[in-house]
Design a protein with these regions (language model features):
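Active-site-proximal alpha-helical segments within enzyme catalytic domains
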Residues: 129, 220-227, 291-313, 369-385
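Active-site helix/loop module of the DD-peptidase/beta-lactamase fold
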Residues: 141-180, 232-290, 322
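Active-site-proximal loop and beta-strand segments within enzyme catalytic domains
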Residues: 47-49, 69, 73-94, 123, ...
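Structured C-terminal helix/loop/strand segments within mature extracytoplasmic catalytic/sensor domains
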Residues: 362-407
């Protein structure tokens, strides 16, 4: 079965950056004028600057980057433990991965780059933040009237027919509180069974009302992805390519693979108004069972810079500022929403990275792969194949410590 692909994008491993603090100012500039104050890298190139050119200490950044070389993940480079960790694979995996790598952006410029940042590797659940962006585009286009609408009002493929599933809203999916019940591509939403789920298998429990319990669950995210496909009626990698990745100058090296058994029939109207069932592949929200988004660190950095700039790229608003704000904020209006989780973005609201501002946030994937964004200091850090946890907190601490006091 052929794999669904979009263009491939260069990858620039983990980006660790520190930027000098800037006092907020009130601006009356027009959007075009405001955008002219920011640097946006043209396709195929990216300007480098010394940290000291942007208010940071050169030696401190160099030391932080040197420290990262001691923090590579112990995951085998050949993905040989994939089944043990996650269970039976459904899609492809590369033969090997790159070593630890990353890039640090300050004010949009590269101030540090290490390892092979063009290697195209699986990024695991960082892909969820890309799905979040497609979700935002869907709302921006009016394809969904309200994020609190039940998904079943829009999607009629049987996935939301049962009374319990009929209560699930788009917001529930985006906050991982949906409690959707069913099976996707041979994987049950219960996560029961060692063979199917490896070390990630769960214990039996009672199902809760949608919106009342957070559970990190890739089966439900894959259901969410299929629902978005049902609205767009074209492969989501194509949506991502034309609406986001091409406009930000991403490379042609990134790939979004589907599972081998993830071909579905989508009802697509033709020019005369008649409907035709068109086979399409539905993408996953990660690489837990193979497939998923394979991308370079440098392309991740472009995506991170777009989010840092609140959805604007070089004078063009690709996705609304309102969506970026909602996606990177907690949602206490839902009883089960996690206080440090937005719409498929991890937040620092609970001080997971103690030295970093509470306003910073990250796309996170196993491996560990991460795109950390710090709007307060105008930083983006992409870091690939690191130990995660305390290592992340320490790296951000070292980057932030490199910010020189304002004169």
């Amino acid at each position: 079965m052929p794999l669904l692909r979009s263009l491939l994008i260069p990858c620039a491993a983990f980006v660790c950056t520190i930027f000098c603090a800037v006092q907020p100012t009130v601006s009356t500039a027009t959007p075009a004028a405001a955008s002219a104050q920011h640097y946006f890298p043209p396709a195929g190139t990216w300007q480098h600057k010394k940290p000291s050119d942007l208010g940071m200490n050169d030696a401190a950044i160099a030391e932080a980057v040197a420290w990262t070389q001691t923090q590579e993940t112990d995951w085998p480079k050949d993905f040989s433990k994939q089944s043990e960790i996650f269970g039976r694979p459904l899609g492809p995996l590369p033969k090997t991965r790159a070593s630890i790598n990353g890039v640090v952006l300050k004010n949009g410029y590269i101030i540090a780059e290490f390892g092979d940042t063009t290697a195209v590797d699986p990024t695991y659940s960082v892909a969820k933040s890309y799905l979040s962006t497609i979700h935002g585009l869907t709302l921006d286009r009016g394809m969904i009237k309200s994020i609190t609408d039940p998904v079943g009002q829009y999607i009629h493929d049987g996935g939301y027919d049962e009374p319990h599933n009929s209560l699930i809203t788009w917001q529930h999916h985006a906050t991982q509180t949906s409690e959707w019940q069913g099976e996707m591509f041979g994987k049950p939403s219960t996560f029961l069974g060692k063979a199917e789920f490896g070390a990630g298998e769960m214990k039996p429990r009672d199902i809760k009302e949608p919106g009342t319990l957070f559970e990190y669950n890739d089966v439900r995210i894959n259901r969410f992805s299929l629902s978005l496909l049902g609205l767009w009626k074209r492969p989501l990698p194509d949506v991502l390519k034309t609406e986001i990745m091409d406009p930000i100058g991403a490379s042609s090296t990134w790939q979004y693979h589907a599972y081998d058994n993830a071909t579905v029939n989508i009802d697509v109207p033709d020019a005369s108004g008649n409907s035709t069932l068109v086979p399409m592949q539905s993408i996953s929200g990660g690489t837990r069972w193979g497939a998923g988004l394979w991308i370079s660190t440098l392309d991740h950095a472009r995506f991170g810079l777009l989010i840092l700039r609140k959805g604007e790229w070089n004078g063009k608003q690709l996705i609304s500022k309102e969506w970026i704000k909602e996606a990177t904020s907690p949602h206490p209006e839902l009883a089960g929403a996690k206080s440090d989780y937005g719409y498929l973005w991890w937040l620092n609201t609970d001080n997971a990275w103690p030295a970093a501002p509470r306003s910073s946030f990250s796309a996170q994937g196993a491996g560990t792969n991460s795109i950390w964004i710090d709007p307060e200091h105008d930083l983006v850090v992409v870091w690939r194949w690191h130990k995660g946890g305390n290592a992340q907190a320490e790296f951000y601490k070292r980057i932030l410590a490199a910010i020189e006091p304002a004169p």
